[in-house]
Amino acid sequence: MKSKVLALLIPALLAAGAAHAAEVYNKDGNKLDLYGKVDGLHYFSDNSAKDGDQSYARLGFKGETQINDQLTGYGQWEYNIQANNTESSKNQSWTRLAFAGLKFADYGSFDYGRNYGVMYDIEGWTDMLPEFGGDSYTNADNFMTGRANGVATYRNTDFFGLVNGLNFAVQYQGNNEGASNGQEGTNNGRDVRHENGDGWGLSTTYDLGMGFSAGAAYTSSDRTNDQVNHTAAGGDKADAWTAGLKYDANNIYLATMYSETRNMTPFGDSDYAVANKTQNFEVTAQYQFDFGLRPAVSFLMSKGRDLHAAGGADNPAGVDDKDLVKYADIGATYYFNKNMSTYVDYKINLLDEDDSFYAANGISTDDIVALGLVYQF
């Protein structure tokens, strides 16, 4: 009986994220759910910047209120707290998500705040590894590729109730920039890597049936003056597109995506290092056993083009094309029940450790093994 319950429950948890949240309040059209997790996590690596304790906790809530029979208000907040530093350490916690919105029956929903960019609608299909993954080109606060500030998002499910399985989203991001180099700046100025000008994006996904889905997304943003004048990528627009496929049925999960970015993707440890173009590929294959074990095999890569980057001793004139991310990943998660799990994730770095480009640009070529024990609710 336990195996059957796990077989039904675990895929639902993976798909819904906080679907197993604890209901705090549900009365008179008002509902509040609390969710969170504690991850006792340790990395093993020859890279001292990664090796060691990585433990953290996350806490969030989702709420909604029924305004009338056609209109619902909602909001979500999620916070991350690191647990691997001293109590006197600074900058060890941050807000991951914080947005509020309105849902208009079959006409869709609109929200504003800190939320996922629409590129992640497709990237999320392959970002399913136990610990690693989702990093060929997506980064938090890098335009609309991951979690981002100041995004207004309209989402529509089943195309106004007319086409089952056809979903789309339209998104606008306001500028977030520092006051320098002729920029007036905004009240939440940040370093050049995390700046962005005004931008927009759209995504669409379609459930093809029998477990198959297809999707695509596109974004285009203005770059700030700092980004145009003080990074290796000189274009005044940052663009990205992606397309993906997934299969999720019969305990099997398969997903793949391809994407390209222009004047957008940072690499290495220098604010100057932004690729003029990247070509990115991710694929993952997973199987959910009835007794709670979920093994996963994945491959991710990002090829940088026209980098104009330091090449190190091997390439004193600099380099233009180079792999920025390239690794295979073997992992497994075991679910004791819906609240407790443990996992191992082995990131096999395929970047050439003998290539001086990586040391010159602060890009690790070392493998990492992650071990985690998770309590979630």
UniProtKB/Swiss-Prot annotation:
Stretches with biased composition (Polar residues): 175-189
Domain of life from the UniProt record: Bacteria
Coiled coil start-end: none
GO CC annotation, single: cell outer membrane
Chief site of localization: membrane
InterPro entries for the chain: Gram-neg_bact_OMP, Gram_neg_porin_domain, Porin_dom_sf, Porin_gammaproteobac, Porin_Gram-ve
Membrane topology category: Multi-pass membrane protein
Family note: Belongs to the Gram-negative porin family.
Function: Forms pores that allow passive diffusion of small molecules across the outer membrane. Non-specific porin.
Protein name: Outer membrane porin N
Species the sequence originates in: Escherichia coli (strain K12)
Lineage: Bacteria, Pseudomonadati, Pseudomonadota, Gammaproteobacteria, Enterobacterales
